Swiss-Prot record:
Family indicated by similarity: Belongs to the LeuD family. LeuD type 1 subfamily.
EC category: lyase
GO cellular component terms listed in the entry, alphabetical order: 3-isopropylmalate dehydratase complex
Protein name (record): 3-isopropylmalate dehydratase small subunit
Catalytic activity field: (2R,3S)-3-isopropylmalate = (2S)-2-isopropylmalate
Gene3D superfamilies assigned to the protein according to its UniProt record, in alphabetical order: Aconitase, domain 4
Pathway given in the UniProt record: Amino-acid biosynthesis; L-leucine biosynthesis; L-leucine from 3-methyl-2-oxobutanoate: step 2/4
Alphabetized NCBIfam families for the sequence: leuD (TIGR00171), PRK01641.1 (NF002458)
Subunit structure: Heterodimer of LeuC and LeuD.
Provenance organism: Burkholderia ambifaria (strain MC40-6)
Amino acid sequence: MEKFTVHTGVVAPLDRENVDTDAIIPKQFLKSIKRTGFGPNAFDEWRYLDHGEPGQDNSKRPLNPDFVLNQPRYQGASVLLARKNFGCGSSREHAPWALQQYGFRAIIAPSFADIFFNNCYKNGLLPIVLTEQQVDHLFNDTYAFNGYQLTVDLDAQVVRTGDGREYPFEIAAFRKYCLLNGFDDIGLTLRHADKIRQFEAERLAKQPWLNNKLVG
């Protein structure tokens, strides 16, 4: 998993409340057994004018010019600004996969659905909770300035604006540690690979009838 320390990027304002996971990545794209390739279909039903299906050549599909991510001023955005209850609806880890593979590194909103919130951390995507008033200010700034950027400093736990304002945010110490070091669940486990191998060797010495090959 890619480390997250300090990130500066263009902000895209998604000015809708209760954006659910089916809007983030529609159900027909969940059939894949792979973990990659979801970025082109993030917000598929809002982003394109036709109905999307797996395997389509998205470069040939008609774009919805009114959708925020299709507007030239927000191209290359890596910080998503959203409204309350972002990521609600059915549980699907494909939602943070799609957002991350689109290019987002952080999402700022007044609140998130719990399961989506947790899934973001597991996939290197930083969900940041600010107050509704703070989010309103950021929406106003994003609309007012073309190419508006924010800096997210995870170590300092602040969101910085170009004019020097800082918005502190909370994050659990363990989650912060994992993001700063680029550790997902597998990465955390592999840090203890030597101890795991030692335990397995000792167990097999005591219980040789369980003689399976060691992993790694």
